[in-house]
């Protein structure tokens, strides 16, 4: 896992150069949004259960997926879906704090789509739930932090799609 600072420094180091204007601007932007990201992470942490509950209600609860024969039918499958959605919200929050998607590649997306496909987990419904979590989160943290978090929710969704 890296953060925005490490990514900028590593890119310059690989080229054997000092930071250029664009690199300095990336760092400046990262530091300027630091307080916003920390406040958003605190709000998400304090409301994670409510985010998951509302996202499930918006996206999955009343669809065919929860009826007998659906992929979320039985308590065990339903619990696994809730667990996975919580995992996505948590790791999207980590990525937002770091200002970098590498943790999502390393700890969430690497092999996940293949695993879901082999287990018969409906990827479309998973993406729908992630997008619902994005919407719920934005409502809690406000438009600026919501847009920032949206980057990481969308990254997960794209990686699964």
From Swiss-Prot:
<dbReference type="Pfam" id="PF00502">
    <property type="entry name" value="Phycobilisome"/>
</dbReference>
<dbReference type="InterPro" id="IPR038719">
    <property type="entry name" value="Phycobilisome_asu/bsu_sf"/>
</dbReference>
<keyword id="KW-0472">Membrane</keyword>
<dbReference type="InterPro" id="IPR012128">
    <property type="entry name" value="Phycobilisome_asu/bsu"/>
</dbReference>
<comment type="similarity">
    <text>Belongs to the phycobiliprotein family.</text>
</comment>
<feature type="binding site" description="covalent">
    <location>
        <position position="81"/>
    </location>
    <ligand>
        <name>(2R,3E)-phycocyanobilin</name>
    </ligand>
</feature>
<keyword id="KW-0157">Chromophore</keyword>
<keyword id="KW-0793">Thylakoid</keyword>
<dbReference type="InterPro" id="IPR006245">
    <property type="entry name" value="Allophycocyanin_b"/>
</dbReference>
<dbReference type="GO" id="GO:0015979">
    <property type="term" value="P:photosynthesis"/>
</dbReference>
<dbReference type="GO" id="GO:0033115">
    <property type="term" value="C:cyanelle thylakoid membrane"/>
</dbReference>
<comment type="subunit">
    <text>Heterodimer of an alpha and a beta chain.</text>
</comment>
<keyword id="KW-0605">Phycobilisome</keyword>
<protein>
    <recommendedName>
        <fullName>Allophycocyanin beta chain</fullName>
    </recommendedName>
</protein>
<keyword id="KW-0934">Plastid</keyword>
<keyword id="KW-0194">Cyanelle</keyword>
<comment type="function">
    <text>Light-harvesting photosynthetic bile pigment-protein from the phycobiliprotein complex. Allophycocyanin has a maximum absorption at approximately 650 nanometers.</text>
</comment>
<dbReference type="InterPro" id="IPR009050">
    <property type="entry name" value="Globin-like_sf"/>
</dbReference>
<keyword id="KW-0488">Methylation</keyword>
<keyword id="KW-0042">Antenna complex</keyword>
<keyword id="KW-0602">Photosynthesis</keyword>
<feature type="modified residue" description="N4-methylasparagine">
    <location>
        <position position="71"/>
    </location>
</feature>
<dbReference type="GO" id="GO:0030089">
    <property type="term" value="C:phycobilisome"/>
</dbReference>
<keyword id="KW-0089">Bile pigment</keyword>
<keyword id="KW-0813">Transport</keyword>
<keyword id="KW-0249">Electron transport</keyword>
């Amino acid at each position: 896992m890296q953060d925005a600072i490490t990514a900028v420094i590593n890119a310059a180091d690989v080229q054997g150069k000092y930071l250029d204007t664009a690199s300095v601007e990336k760092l400046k932007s990262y530091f300027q949004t630091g307080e916003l990201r920390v406040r958003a992470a605190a709000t998400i942490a304090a409301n994670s259960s409510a985010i998951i509950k509302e996202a499930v209600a918006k996206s999955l609860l009343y669809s065919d997926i929860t009826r007998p024969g659906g992929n979320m039918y039985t308590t065990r499958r339903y619990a696994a879906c809730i667990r996975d959605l919580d995992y996505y919200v948590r790791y999207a929050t980590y990525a937002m704090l770091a200002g970098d998607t590498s943790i999502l590649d390393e700890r969430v997306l690497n092999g996940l789509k293949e695993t879901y496909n082999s287990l018969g987990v409906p990827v479309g419904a998973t993406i729908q739930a992630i997008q619902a979590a994005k919407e719920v989160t934005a409502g809690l943290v406000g438009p600026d932090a919501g847009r920032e978090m949206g980057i990481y929710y969308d990254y997960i969704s794209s990686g699964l799609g």
